UniProtKB/Swiss-Prot annotation:
This is Histone-lysine N-methyltransferase, H3 lysine-4 specific. It comes from Neurospora crassa (strain ATCC 24698 / 74-OR23-1A / CBS 708.71 / DSM 1257 / FGSC 987). Its EC number is 2.1.1.354. Residues 1-205, 400-458, 555-607, 667-792, 842-908, 932-982 are annotated as: Disordered. It is found in: Nucleus; Chromosome. GO terms for cellular component: chromosome; Set1C/COMPASS complex. Residues 19-31, 194-204, 559-607, 758-784, 868-884, 960-978 have a biased composition (Basic and acidic residues). Belongs to the class V-like SAM-binding methyltransferase superfamily. Residues 1171-1288 form the SET domain. Residues 702-716, 895-907 have a biased composition (Basic residues). The lineage of its organism: Eukaryota, Fungi, Dikarya, Ascomycota, Pezizomycotina.
Amino acid sequence: MSRSSGASFAQFFPAAPRAARDRATERERARMRAQASPPTQPLDTNGHRTPLSSFTSNRSDDGASPGRSHITSLNHSSSAGADATRPPLEDTESLPGDTLNTVGSASSHTSTSSSIFSSSTRQPAMASASVRNSHTHNSTTPLTTAGSPSSLYLSTSLHAKPHSVSPHHADKQNGLTPTLNGSATDSLVPLPDGTERVPPRDPSRSVLCTICTYDPLLDKKLSSSEKKKAKPIYKDYGLNDEDDAPPSDPRLAHGGKLSYINVNFHLPKAQLIDAPSNLKPYPYDPKTSCGPGPPVQILVRGFNPLIAFTKVTTIFASFGDIAESSNKMHPETGSYLGFATIRYKDSKPTSSRPVPVPAHQAARRAVRGMHGRRIEANQVRVEFDPEGRKSKALMEAVLKKSRETSQTPNAAYKIPTGPKPRAGEVIPGPPPTAPKGPAAHRALGGSEAGWTSTKPRHPNIIETEPIVNHIKSEPYIFVAHEYVPVMPTTVAHMKKRLKQYGFDDIRADRTGYYIIFRDSHYGRDEASKCYNSANDTAFFTYSMVMDLHLFGTVGKSSRSSEDHRRHSYGSEKRPPPEHRQRDDQDRRRRDEEADIEEEKKQRAKNLDPVKEAAEVIRREMTEHLLKTIRTKITLPAVFDYLNPVNHAAKRRKLNIDDSHSGTIPSIVFDDSEGRSSPVGTPNSRADPIERRTARADVSTLRVRKLKSRGVNARKHGFNDPFARARPTQRVDLRSLHHRLNSDSDDDSDDGVDNRYSMIRDTEEPESRPRSRVSSEEDRNKEETGSWVAGEDDSMTEASFALNDTSALLKKRKLDLPAETAVKRQKKAEELFEATIARIETELPSQEQAVESVTPTGVEAPLNGLPDADVKAEPAEDKETEDSRLPTPIPDNTKPKKKAKAKKKSKKQIFEEREALKKQQQETFEREALRAAGIEDIEGTPDAEAKSQVGEPEPVPEPELETKGEALEAPETESKPDLDPELYPSEVVDALVLPKDFNLDIGTLKLVPFHGEDGPDAQRLQRKFGTAKLDCDAELWLWRRNRIRQLNSEDGSVDKPVGIGGYYVPNPTGCARTEGVKKILNSEKSKYLPHHIKVKKAREEREKNAKNGNTNSVAAAAEAARLAADSLVAKGNSRANRVNNRRYVAEINDQRKNFGQDSDVLRFNQLKKRKKPVKFARSAIHNWGLYAMENINKDDMIIEYVGEEVRQQIAELREARYLKSGIGSSYLFRIDDNTVIDATKKGGIARFINHSCMPNCTAKIIKVEGSKRIVIYALRDIAQNEELTYDYKFEREIGSTDRIPCLCGTAACKGFLN
């Protein structure tokens, strides 16, 4: 479209401020001119003259909007120029938005015209447009446009009926062509001839409406009283011509003053206002609104389809209640597509959401809150989908895409066909007997070629020329095509299969595969390794038979004898018989596997679940029956038959020794001549460490002795019964566990009977604290010096490899009386924690006594000083004492001091005296021995040292009679000048003790001690250091006697405080070797206070039941005791009363608020006043809960707190607890659907045990809408009394898994269930 040459800036930009002012001025002038001279022709709505002769439509060039139509004549030369220069006559022509909207105009939102004119012009215009080109007209009928209102002003005097003439014929009559300027041909509408037209306005003016020009209620200048008195002013609208004109543009009112610009200055950025704002829509109300209503369904897409859909629904459920959610799946594959629809529903107010949320509001909040957000790592899009059309469109798009993908095959995965053979060319293939390849690679045409290429870019994987001609000296392995068919895809699989071997390349031709290696020593090694490992192994369904050539084709002779196969293209030779047989076996195996699979499929198809379940149950019952017969019938019968007690008569009949029938057999030691011991273990040569750590009985250990290879080979160290030859010396080392059982080696080396030695070993470590044993060892080590290399622990690994050349001398056995004395002496040490003087345990015969007292290998001390630290030892005693000492002697010429002396009986002392009578020694030897004996005597008393360091029961220790004093007896005969009181001529007992003597502080007063018998205080102070008691010695002694008097039944102070049967020896000698064993209740009842109480109560009830409750005195005493306990329980302390008064005011306030709900009141009171309770070990079962103060009846004690779970979850947890080994589960049922689980999350109330006569009860109360479990007191509960209540399990009489009840009350039912 071309524009006129005279177009100005104002024509192209009519909305400019200056152009607006000019156009307003022109309109005022035209209005004044029109009023001065009234028009002779009718005016259109734009103020133009409308001639009735002929009309046409054309676009004006004066800057009017494209929607405005100007009525001009068909003579373009005259009217066009006049219209182009004529200014507009009305205000409606000023701006595009001010024109009267007709059919085809812009939106009604962009116009400020009156709705009256719009309605009056739109109806006839549409009527004329509907009959366009359908009615006839003559030459007098004008043509008009669909948007022109000028046809409305036609004279009403033209009344002509329409003729039935075609539009084409009418055009010929009028001499008009249907094609006019521009697009006006489409809007030409011939009016019917003589049609009576309705005028747009009624010629007679009428009142259209009434306008309020003044409203006193809106006048801010008037007061309230004046507003009531004043009356509004109304004006009729429609009587004047000005009322027909559209209202003026309010934006032009301030054009001259403010230079109006169409912007909003109240915002930070100038915002262009194109149209007036629309009214706010009314909120949706289902009662009054019409239509479907706002959307309640949304579409969510873009999330990961692999995540759990519950995560998506959980996120969107935060905006409102979800009525329905659908995660869309592919209808054919069943895979999720990554988009879903969620429909909301109206939510009711809840505790978490007190305000109800309508469904449409929840959907709107979800769209606003989640659109563009991320779910995990993916950004999602959320939009409304009220009818599911969007989701349906997405589903159709996915299905269409999948169909297109399935219909058009992918070129990347398309298997290309190989080159077709030339005419007359025959391509050799595998022989008929060769194994067939996979079905995907078999030829479809029968006689077609046998291989294809997987990738078109590698068409020459299978080489046409023989490869063997190109291989010179490189080592290679040949795999013939008879074993593995030649196919291009097999080369890649073979490379992956043999990638662990260093080959250079794998090439293939029609004869087979060539695995080529590097021409070096490394390459030949790799080829050999590959041949040895992969030859004749399975390769898919084939057997990969290899032929190794280490030096290629021109090198040395290869290992293959079938080289001709490399030069032949298609060898007709059949495989060797062994390979053919192997192939047949593989084929049969594959056929059998196929038959088995087919049978499995048939079984699965015809499977009957009932029969299969019955078969499984039958099989399990058979296994259970066999297991029951084996464990319940067979094993007990075999054990009863093999019990040695049942065969005692038969052993006596056959004269078989009954020594092995006891529980702990004796260990018989061999002598020095090399006779082996008859006692041994089945695995006596096993690792000594394993034998040490295993749970083996002492009776199974074998004590070995070495032959004497020289007495001086190993002078200092232990005589280990398990020691072997020690070729080398070892580093000074001593393990710590030796200190825990320091006397075990002494007893075994002395040849004591194993039965009694085991008892002594197990008693000593149990009765002595570990700290005391360790401290004694340390003190002895400090006195004797540092450790020597020859000392070693007998139970370490390195000790078995060291050389031990020392010879053990003969062992002697103690008789029963002597061992009984030793045990009695040890028992006294246990009770008083004091060490008594040495009593030698050996009982030598007359010949051995002479040998034992002969000093051999001991140098005489110089000058015969009596205070020398040298002591003469017999040879045998020296050797045995050397093995018994906890520390060795640092020097060979200086014998060590004994840390712990051997204990002897009176009989042994007497026999030694007799032996010493027969031996006459020099005076200096006897003086030295006597001095050593005195020093040893001084070293033994530990009681006073214990009292100085603060031991709980320090007791001074007497000196009984030692070897040193015994050696003084012969001195009287050789030296008559000695004191006859000290050295009498006849042997008399130095200290005569009664048979019932018990070592105690009270009995020490009755023992006559000599002046030299007292301990050396300076030496003890130098050895142990000084310490102080926390009180006076007499006060300590008085407390000790008082404690003994209160804890004894008869009030005696002689008996020590102890529990009978508390110290139980371990059968193996050490608690660590016992492993884990359950302590019986019978043993717990000896030392646990609660068990003792329960045991006494049970015995008392049994006694009363046996006597028929005839003891009225005891019953009265029991009733009095219960009454006293009740009074004590009812009485509260003053502090408790003060605390009770403190809450009186608050309790009254709560009572007013809660009314009669006493349980809630007491529960709130329990929160602030919890009863002090504690948990401790219980006599009933494991842990129990105890009251720390007196509790009155009906008092609320504690709440049962735990995790609240559903019934189904509780059943699963109970099974899991039993399976995991927890055993005790703390599940408390509130109702049929709720269970409190306090097993892993809970309070101490879960430790309350069951009792058939409980003192508490459990009640379920409702607090703030939730159910709580609270424990009440059934009766008055005394302090330190255990809290119990009845579990109320359902009775399962006849069940095999009933739970025994351990409450021990008089009304005990025996079982919980």
